[in-house]
């Protein structure tokens, strides 16, 4: 009888483990569709083979691994991200989207992923800075739907600055090089690695002082109703920060602290 009971206990344990396997596998095959605009190296950009790579992508892939899901990267224009999220064409936005009060009225955000300063880029020797007074009458390019556009419209336009919005950041750079605009406002890292460190950016540099957009850093945008997904991603981010994985990923791209306070 004793051996029979032991066998029953072992059998019950094995059956319990077997029953757990489909649940794990189901979680592992779950797909999270991240919307991204691959025009922001080193955050996200198209590789020669057509795949999307960058800091955001590496962070997203690690998050998916930790929540036992598979990432699917959906290429979208930045200005169309929130509408696509509401239309359920994507599950989340991971594309250097700053956490702002205006956006928080429409969607939820995860905890912060990173936080960078913003700068003005112009041709070397430009006789203006990043303050509204010196920019009066100038044409400044920004990406449509970005926090840079919001800042420029509220802080500069009332003082006579002409703000030109573009669908993509590469279009901003193209018009800057061709002289159609006098300057561009964007994130420091995207400006430095995506333009100034490239051949077409050799005649340009930062002008004026760094600017604060009033945001709370960059997070992952999620529908407000997706409470469970947000909680699981927040837990993944916290564990990445705690075990050093976040720092290891960041060091692939940057030599400075990307997270901030």
What name fits each language-model region?
Residues 33, 38-41, 52-65, 98, ...:
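Bilobed "Venus flytrap"/periplasmic-binding protein-like clamshell domains
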Residues 38, 114-122, 188, 196-238, ...:
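Periplasmic-binding protein-like
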Residues 57-66, 126, 133-134, 138-139, ...:
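Extended ligand-binding regions for polar small-molecule ligands
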Residues 70, 147-164, 202-206, 235-261:
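Ligand-binding clefts/hinges and TM-proximal coupling segments of bilobed small-molecule sensing domains
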């Amino acid at each position: 009888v004793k051996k029979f009971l032991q066998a029953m206990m072992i059998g019950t344990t094995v059956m319990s483990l077997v029953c757990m396997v489909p649940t794990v596998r189901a979680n592992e095959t779950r797909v999270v569709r991240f919307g991204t605009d691959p025009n922001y190296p080193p955050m996200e950009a198209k590789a020669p083979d057509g795949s999307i790579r960058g800091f955001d992508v590496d962070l997203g892939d690690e998050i998916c691994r930790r929540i036992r899901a598979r990432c699917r990267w959906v290429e979208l224009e930045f200005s169309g991200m929130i509408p696509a999220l509401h239309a359920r064409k994507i599950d989340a936005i991971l594309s250097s989207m700053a956490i702002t009060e205006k956006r928080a009225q429409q969607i939820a955000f995860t905890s912060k992923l990173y936080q960078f300063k913003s700068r003005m880029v112009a041709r070397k020797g430009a006789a203006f800075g990043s303050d509204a007074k010196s920019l009066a009458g100038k044409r400044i390019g920004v990406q449509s739907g970005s926090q840079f556009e919001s800042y420029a419209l509220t802080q500069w336009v009332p003082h006579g600055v002409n703000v030109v919005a573009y669908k993509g950041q590469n279009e901003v750079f193209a018009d800057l090089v061709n002289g159609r605009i006098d300057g561009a406002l964007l994130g420091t890292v995207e400006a430095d690695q995506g333009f100034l460190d490239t051949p077409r950016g050799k005649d340009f540099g930062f002008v004026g002082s760094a600017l604060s957009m009033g945001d709370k850093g960059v997070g992952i945008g999620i529908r407000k109703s997706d409470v469970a997904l947000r909680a699981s991603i927040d837990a993944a981010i916290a564990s990445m920060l705690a075990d050093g994985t976040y720092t290891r990923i960041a060091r692939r791209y940057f030599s400075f602290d990307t997270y901030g306070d």
